[in-house]
């Protein structure tokens, strides 16, 4: 990367000392801005150079830029920042006329006087080459902005979405769909309420084996536009499918279910609701038995193939929420020639026949794991995560319905009323209401459940497109505006937006106390509580009052899409920024994405009113609207709750600290934490919480209110939003049990390590390895918890991959990288080599202990870790002797 001044001289071989054009412009100095762009802009070549457009010789400066934009657009190079906001208008009068639906600031800048002079200085060819084949980044004294080139200097290629849309073949899309990763979404959260049968197993497969049903089933498994089946093979496949349907008709599903996964005896009161789940191992056994009795032996092909399919079935049932299995892993180690029902044995096995067999096998395995197995699972089990976790649990439908029926009856009676004026629940455009489907999630507390409203997205593709447009142009901008209004409002307490900020806020409070009390913490009083059924209890009219108050000093909103590239982590994130309120940090590269939405104050009010007053829950053939409160799951519910509970903290004087006292109040959603030197204030807040916050219709969960003192018990640790807080020393850490195991599914070891580094960075972003907050022992304990989590993710990611020399070298580089990240985040290590040694040892030893559970698999990694620890011990031995 070179500054433009050097780029002109080195790349273009222009001697600025003797160039007459430059000298003439230089006389004007800063008045024309040329000198500024030469010294503040940097050029970086694209790794994939492309041909330049052919331009007429008489074009103006602005016309040259427009032609470059058209050239990029026609080549579908939409990642180039010059194309952002532009489209090509095509009609019978105009062939290639640029249309700009949002102002592109970069193009406006390039069309200015300074860049026009630069154009005249270097010539049109060099100027166009710079626009097409380079990235230009400008520094404004505070941060960097990309003004030319592909986003983050990506190679010249159409973006993936353009490649997908340019493929006119529906067949190509269907083939791609066949080989996409397999997820558990097909069988999650499938309610079976008020059905004539708890287990409608007749719908798993057609109940008849007529020619039409056989043909329909065959074409569902082997789409005719994807694979050609010779007539003789059709007969063979039909015979196998006929056996399948006959077995289905004779199979006593419920008897097998009761034998393997029997309903638990006793009433709901006798057992906790979570203890009534069917163990995953039993569910697996049930599905295996069903498949063995349902599928003819030839469909498996062989015992080896059956074993592989069963192994993958176990992986499917073990997937966490949002987990997936790469499709090629389902095919791995399957012997295609064992699927004899998919080819004619007396036909010579040519390359073409093998390719056809391969395609048939892909279709069959895809159908098995995307259709048949999910249908079997969802027919007999309600599959769901437990609230705030990602592990999937399984309940028999009859057991689940018994558990939730009392809750649903009470919920509908208390909060909902039937919507008698709605007659079109399925349509997004023809109904005056926003319909949502009901999802029920069990909580950890006994017999407690959470209802989530999942927005319906329309009855067909056309309505889905309209839904997406409204979500992009109205809902998402309004969500960001609500967050902007919340952030802008001055409050007496410090607002936090994520659990990653908890430790930082407590550190600031702790440092303030230590400074005030001569490096000794005073006695502190803690209280935490959460609001009972917070979404259901939110008063909607109060919501609108708070919103309208927040809008009084506003004059509309511009919501602009902007990219921010973190140069430290290599992560590129897209943000919707309201009224230019986000300023790039010094380590960020700013890339304007141009797309802008403008909403007036009344627009915001209209969108919010539609969301909170006209969202309906669609259950079977009826829909229900709320009497009050909000549906959890709506895009706007969470920011509305934040606005309301911020107002609650400002309204009640009990939350205001006395002038001579120090109080920290943290609120995240409906969870509240108070830490204060003022015992009376905590007593007053507890009394208020016990009685309820009447103005806001909010009641605290009385059995979850916790109040402790730092002097009452030396070992008291409280949890707040999955963070552990040691009350005596005001130290904070995150336990490994609160960290989800991130499932990385990739065949690329390089990609796996890249994901692990990003995950490690997320884990230490909670800022709990700061010695201004925590003691050295707590810092080391936190590092150990993080390493436990990362090492488990590592073992899971390489479960089916071999550990070779290349991987071991990558593992070594990975260790060095996370050690560097940890040392960088723990400044005391720079002052004390012994602490740095302990940090390094904690990381290395943590991996060693974890990988030692499978010494045969990770033998090379273990040898490497032991050598690294020995080198570290030798180094510290020498250091101690030198110091002494």
From Swiss-Prot:
Give me the disulphide-bonded residues.
none
Q: A Gene Ontology MF term for this entry?
A: telomeric DNA binding
Ranges for domain Reverse transcriptase: 422-725
Is Cell division among the key words of this record? no
Name the catalysed reactions.
DNA(n) + a 2'-deoxyribonucleoside 5'-triphosphate = DNA(n+1) + diphosphate
Which InterPro entries has this protein been placed in?
RT_dom, Telomerase_RBD, Telomerase_RT
Report if keyword Nucleus is assigned: yes
Q: Which GO terms describe its cellular component?
A: chromosome, telomeric region; nucleolus; nucleus; telomerase catalytic core complex; telomerase holoenzyme complex
| Location within or outside the cell | Nucleus; Chromosome, Telomere
Q: Which GO BP terms, alphabetically?
A: telomere maintenance via telomerase
Protein known as: Telomerase reverse transcriptase
